[in-house]
């Protein structure tokens, strides 16, 4: 991570409107990962990440920050829902599977990077195998036959091979079918009960390694053969042991886990029965966040320096309802603000791939023009804010519902009206949505 905090915030600004406190907090946390790695090993061991707790209503950008952060991090990153996990002893996934999944992400990232480095060598090897299939090598003669007689044949064969190589690189043979030997991959999935994912994964790995030693003959088009053989050759060239050790080190030093919906595992006041397992999940999470050692199929992983970012709406429970030990492990608290009508106007127009741009480009594929006026966008934002205010406040997600309702007729008829166009202004928005927005009973069910 070589980006400065200011650059990280600027990048997040392209996709997320407002919420500067949250952006600054995650930007500083990301940069601190880089700063720590510049220190000596002894001091580096003593510096632990400051975990972040993001608090705010639904639809204000918590999950979107996580999504964009994963693109910027350049490090093993995993986003999980806290509600997917159960206390040890209950049916479901245990929290240690978070670290196992994070290691899987790291191994995949490291392998992809290693494969990119050997891509040109792998492509050359794949090309030779395809040429061997197109021009089978000449069979050897009788024992003791003079080698001098073989040389003209070799030259002739080499010239033919060069001609085919040129055609192959120009794409002239892409659709020709050839028969090649490829590794046989298992065509079955091992199913296991909840909580046994690690054992199932190991069994799957054993079966895959056994079957990968065998090969089978397949008839493929040349372009498909080049791709499949290229992948095979790349897999032969990379060092799997090196990939695993690099991935484990990357997880331990730079791993980031984003825990969404953490408020859903808070025990509610006066609740009995199944709610007991909510507190159990928190207590199971505690060792991971504090720092522990987790066994994975690639080796042991220490979680001491993994950064945890948690988020939740906390509209029923409060952050203080988390078990005290877990509260203490999230020292940085960031509150995200509810969105206003002005924020909705900005969300509809400013971000990269904004909603208005998405619908415009979608209908452009039908040769149908769609444009929005400023007053049309303002009216859309006002209606979204009003509906949120009167019924359940779901933040920016309300805009998706309203846009779909607004453009339902246009999207349906666009195919029959190619070459035409429409401008969405305030009058059009009122015509389509005003009655629904004003009728509280209807807006609850439709918008």
UniProtKB/Swiss-Prot annotation:
ATP binds at residues 17, 59-64, 260, 325, 397. Residues 148-159 have a biased composition (Basic and acidic residues). InterPro entries: AAA+_ATPase (IPR003593), ATP-dep_Clp_protease_ClpX (IPR050052), ATPase_AAA_core (IPR003959), Clp_ATPase_C (IPR019489), HslU (IPR004491), P-loop_NTPase (IPR027417). It is found in: Cytoplasm. Keywords: ATP-binding, Chaperone, Cytoplasm, Nucleotide-binding, Stress response. SUPFAM superfamilies: P-loop containing nucleoside triphosphate hydrolases (SSF52540). GO terms for cellular component: HslUV protease complex. It comes from the Bacteria. Gene3D superfamilies: 1.10.8.60, DNA helicase RuvA subunit, C-terminal domain, P-loop containing nucleotide triphosphate hydrolases. GO terms for biological process: protein unfolding; proteolysis involved in protein catabolic process. Disulfide bonds: none annotated. The keyword rRNA-binding does not apply. Residues 136-160 are annotated as: Disordered. GO terms for molecular function: ATP binding; ATP hydrolysis activity; peptidase activity; proteasome-activating activity. Belongs to the ClpX chaperone family. HslU subfamily. A double ring-shaped homohexamer of HslV is capped on each side by a ring-shaped HslU homohexamer. The assembly of the HslU/HslV complex is dependent on binding of ATP. ATPase subunit of a proteasome-like degradation complex; this subunit has chaperone activity. The binding of ATP and its subsequent hydrolysis by HslU are essential for unfolding of protein substrates subsequently hydrolyzed by HslV. HslU recognizes the N-terminal part of its protein substrates and unfolds these before they are guided to HslV for hydrolysis. This is ATP-dependent protease ATPase subunit HslU.
């Amino acid at each position: 991570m070589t980006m400065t905090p200011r650059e990280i915030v600027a990048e997040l600004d392209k996709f997320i409107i407002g919420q500067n406190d949250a952006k600054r907090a995650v930007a500083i946390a990301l940069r601190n990962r880089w700063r720590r790695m510049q220190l000596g090993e002894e001091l580096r061991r003593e510096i632990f990440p400051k975990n972040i707790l993001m608090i705010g209503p639904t639809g204000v950008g918590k999950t979107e920050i996580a999504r964009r952060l994963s693109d910027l991090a350049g490090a093993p990153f995993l986003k999980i829902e806290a509600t997917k996990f159960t206390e040890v002893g209950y049916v479901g996934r245990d929290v240690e599977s978070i670290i196992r999944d994070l290691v899987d992400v790291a191994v995949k990232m490291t392998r992809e990077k290693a494969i990119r480095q050997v891509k040109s060598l792998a492509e050359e090897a794949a090309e030779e195998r395809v040429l061997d299939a197109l021009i089978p090598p000449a069979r050897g003669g009788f024992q003791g036959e003079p080698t001098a007689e073989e040389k003209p044949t070799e030259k002739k064969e080499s010239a033919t091979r060069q001609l085919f190589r040129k055609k192959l690189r120009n794409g002239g043979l892409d659709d020709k079918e050839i028969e090649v030997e490829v590794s046989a991959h298992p065509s079955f999935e091992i199913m296991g009960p909840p909580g046994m994912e690690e054992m199932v994964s190991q069994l799957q790995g054993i079966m895959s390694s056994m079957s990968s030693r065998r090969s089978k003959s397949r008839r493929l088009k040349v372009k498909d053969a080049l791709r499949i053989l290229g992948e095979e050759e790349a897999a032969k060239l990379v060092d799997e042991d090196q990939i695993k050790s690099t991935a484990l080190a990357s997880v331990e030093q730079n791993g980031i886990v984003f825990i969404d919906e953490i408020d859903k595992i808070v025990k509610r006041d006066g609740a009995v029965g199944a709610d007991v397992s909510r507190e159990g999940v928190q207590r199971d999470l505690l060792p991971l966040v504090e720092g522990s050692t987790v066994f994975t199929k690639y080796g042991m992983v220490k979680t001491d320096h993994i950064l945890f970012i948690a988020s939740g709406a906390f509209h029923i429970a409060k952050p203080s309802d988390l078990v005290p030990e877990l509260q203490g492990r999230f020292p940085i608290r960031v509150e995200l603000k509810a969105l206003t009508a002005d924020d909705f106007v900005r969300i509809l127009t400013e971000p990269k791939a904004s909603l208005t741009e998405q619908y415009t480009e979608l209908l452009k594929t039908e040769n149908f023009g769609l444009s929005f006026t400023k007053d049309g966008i303002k009216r859309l934002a006002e209606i979204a804010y009003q509906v949120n205010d009167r019924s359940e406040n779901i933040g920016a997600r309300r805009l998706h519902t309203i846009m779909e309702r607004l453009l339902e007729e246009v999207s349906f008829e666009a195919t029959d009206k190619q070459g035409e166009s429409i401008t969405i202004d305030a009058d059009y928005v009122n015509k389509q949505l005003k009655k629904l927005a004003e009728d509280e009973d209807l807006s609850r069910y439709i918008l």
